[in-house]
Each structure stands twice: as structure tokens, then as C-alpha cells.
């Protein structure tokens, strides 16, 4: 088997895992979107929140290898923030904005609500010039 054939075989062999990982990461991004839409309170969806799933701007390989980031731009009224997430074992690792980071193990509503609050707090702090170590997190 040539090196080229080995590459094609490997890509084919892990294609289902890649697809599953992409669905899970996009599930987190969609859950965050729903949580941000309801950040105004139950029954009061925010109409000025939108999400566009995009290729990760730092992506260097296509298709995306296992463990790499999946991304979306979130429009939060007057600003936009890039959120990147990847699956690391059974935990999601993510980053957003200039230096925001998060880890999530569950995709339930409570976890997504907590993540939405964290993103909103930290993005607000980024605009206010507050350093991440000054933030009071959960």
C-alpha cells in the first residue's frame, strides 16, 4: 500500500467518527445559541441574537481531523464573537473572543445557560477592559 493509499484508507476509516464529533460540537454551538436567545428571561426571546456556523478560521486541513475545532460566529446585538469548540475525550473545550475559554461536559439546558451567562459576562468585560483573572466566575 502506498503512502497515498494509506492516507485515503485512514480518512475513510475515521469518517464516521469525524461526522459524530462534528454533530456533537455543532450540538453544543446550537445549545449555546438557544441559551443566548433566552438570556432575556423565559418567554422573552432576544431577536438580535444570531449564529452562523463557519469553518474554523485556523483550520489547516480538510476534512477536519479528530479533536480539531468547530466554529460559529454569534451576533449579540451590536457585537459579534467567534466561538470555537472541540471534543477532548468526553469533555468539550472551547474558546471565544480575545481570551475566553470554557469546558463543558453536559449539553443540558442548565449547562448551556451557565455557558451563555459566562460568554455574555466575559465579552462584556472584554469591552470594558477587565482582565480575565479579575472576573468572578461561578
Predicted regions and their residues:
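Alpha-helix boundary/N-cap detector
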Residues: 2, 16, 20-23, 27, ...
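Intrinsically disordered, low-complexity regulatory segments enriched in Ser/Thr/Pro
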Residues: 60-115
Amino acid at each position: 500500500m502506498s503512502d497515498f493509499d494509506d492516507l485515503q484508507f485512514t480518512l475513510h476509516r475515521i469518517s464516521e467518527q469525524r461526522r459524530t464529533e462534528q454533530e456533537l460540537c455543532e450540538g453544543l454551538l446550537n445549545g449555546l445559541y438557544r441559551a443566548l436567545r433566552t438570556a432575556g428571561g423565559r418567554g422573552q426571546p432576544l431577536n438580535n441574537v444570531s449564529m452562523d456556523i463557519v469553518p474554523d478560521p485556523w483550520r489547516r486541513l480538510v476534512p477536519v481531523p479528530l479533536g480539531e475545532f468547530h466554529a460559529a460566529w454569534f451576533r449579540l446585538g451590536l457585537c459579534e464573537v467567534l466561538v470555537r469548540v472541540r471534543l477532548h475525550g468526553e469533555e468539550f473545550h472551547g474558546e471565544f473572543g480575545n481570551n475566553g475559554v470554557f469546558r463543558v461536559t453536559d449539553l443540558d439546558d442548565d449547562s448551556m445557560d451557565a455557558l451563555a451567562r459566562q460568554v455574555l459576562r466575559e465579552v462584556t468585560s472584554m469591552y470594558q477592559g477587565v482582565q480575565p483573572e479579575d472576573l468572578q466566575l461561578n
